[in-house]
């Protein structure tokens, strides 16, 4: 990505941020706290409020510094002193969102701080006008069609300054943001990497870089600075790339070295458990986080997703009311209320709140995906497709949006499109059985039964959360008249259901017992056939067949019909599914490249 020469060349410009240097590890927490307090002030001066808040929260989690260790603010340069009046006035206008006015009074300033605020004010002015035009003239699904008209001018000016080595770490960050907005991804990555070398303490640059990394291979080729901030970046990107085990190891390491009181790290761990669907663990961590930081709004939409999945209506209602009292105009609050109405099956109201969230922040990923789900519930497939596509525009790593598009095209009976989107979802979540089952169903519809069998088998091997894969595989074997394999799958399905203490509410349980009863009957295994037939009598849809089969077995026994001599034990575990030959070993590697729409 960014060449070392370019990093060195830009490093000379970093002198505009005096005193900002980092240590490579966590051996000196006092020094790290000083750095965090310093960068919190520097980002606040430049209007980078989210980065300032992140740094301040992290600093707060570390032990307090003695008076002798507290550092004074960096001294003013000659250029800063000349621009101090214009900067002070412009910053006041900036803080009340009068961006054009701020830029007007900063025009011609020479200090790097004033220059950054001048360019950033112009950028935010363009963003504000774009959002205002979007809200006034178009529905929320059309946001991507309105552009920030200031971007091209900003790119030309920042590029000229960059070539002249006149950008400090903050200027590089803004240049990268402009490039990303213009979809110049490779150039943006190079610039963000430079920004992390020049000013490694600025979390905003790391976060922007994180949003552009699409896979682990891409991450390997980045030339990143050797600093403790890199550990926070890696933990975050691992979570985003669904590499949850690696992410949790990183966060545990950060806790061990001294950040155990960081609400940011605790929330990220909860998000990681949410991503691997360890719902109980994630709920427990979020509840503990709410006790420690009761007015926190960040990540509460993720917490509401967990409450939604568990159908915890009263808890979700309490959370929605609580967040409304704190700040009802936050994006996360709107998403929580949307989830609350969705759980109550009031999908029109839910979609309305997700639209409100998007008016507040058009790039808020969760709202696009959740709105797509609501449109699916309302059978509005065209609107759902638009919403999911916008989610992918915001973040191509969002497997839920790819999966949602697959479901939508499945409803529209367009299997080739459906296959493409399910494959993209599977690439992002290779060990998620839901993606594999969906792929298998798609291959079935395309009559690619070998690929379908691979998918169902793999879904079972990685841990079938919905208990569907074995039944679907069994039915596929039935269709191919592979009776022994079908019986093995049904037996394993029954054993799995009973071993985990499931009730008899599974829809396919009666199907499994009916097939096994008939299979054992054909094999003249009267005891096993009789056991399965008796089980069939417990279900309404198979009761009569079970009784009829029991009568036939009794009649054949009375006639002296003898069972087969090689009778296995009841509900035997076939060798192919035994503990010493697990499904994971038998399943062939999944090749999903055979069909390309």
UniProtKB/Swiss-Prot annotation:
Residues recorded with modification N-acetylalanine: 2
Pfam families: ANAPC8, TPR_11, TPR_8
Record's GO cellular component terms: anaphase-promoting complex
Residue positions where Phosphothreonine is found in the record: 562, 582, 596
Pathway: Protein modification; protein ubiquitination
PTM annotation (Phosphoserine): residues: 578, 588, 593
Keywords, alphabetical: Acetylation, Cell cycle, Cell division, Isopeptide bond, Mitosis, Phosphoprotein, Repeat, TPR repeat, Ubl conjugation, Ubl conjugation pathway
Modification Phosphotyrosine occurs at: 273
Example GO BP: protein K48-linked ubiquitination
Superkingdom of the source species: Eukaryota
Known function: Component of the anaphase promoting complex/cyclosome (APC/C), a cell cycle-regulated E3 ubiquitin ligase that controls progression through mitosis and the G1 phase of the cell cycle. The APC/C complex acts by mediating ubiquitination and subsequent degradation of target proteins: it mainly mediates the formation of 'Lys-11'-linked polyubiquitin chains and, to a lower extent, the formation of 'Lys-48'- and 'Lys-63'-linked polyubiquitin chains. The APC/C complex catalyzes assembly of branched 'Lys-11'-/'Lys-48'-linked branched ubiquitin chains on target proteins.
Subunit note: The mammalian APC/C is composed at least of 14 distinct subunits ANAPC1, ANAPC2, CDC27/APC3, ANAPC4, ANAPC5, CDC16/APC6, ANAPC7, CDC23/APC8, ANAPC10, ANAPC11, CDC26/APC12, ANAPC13, ANAPC15 and ANAPC16 that assemble into a complex of at least 19 chains with a combined molecular mass of around 1.2 MDa; APC/C interacts with FZR1 and FBXO5. Interacts with FBXO43; the interaction is direct.
Family classification: Belongs to the APC8/CDC23 family.
UniProt name for this protein: Cell division cycle protein 23 homolog
Organism of origin: Mus musculus
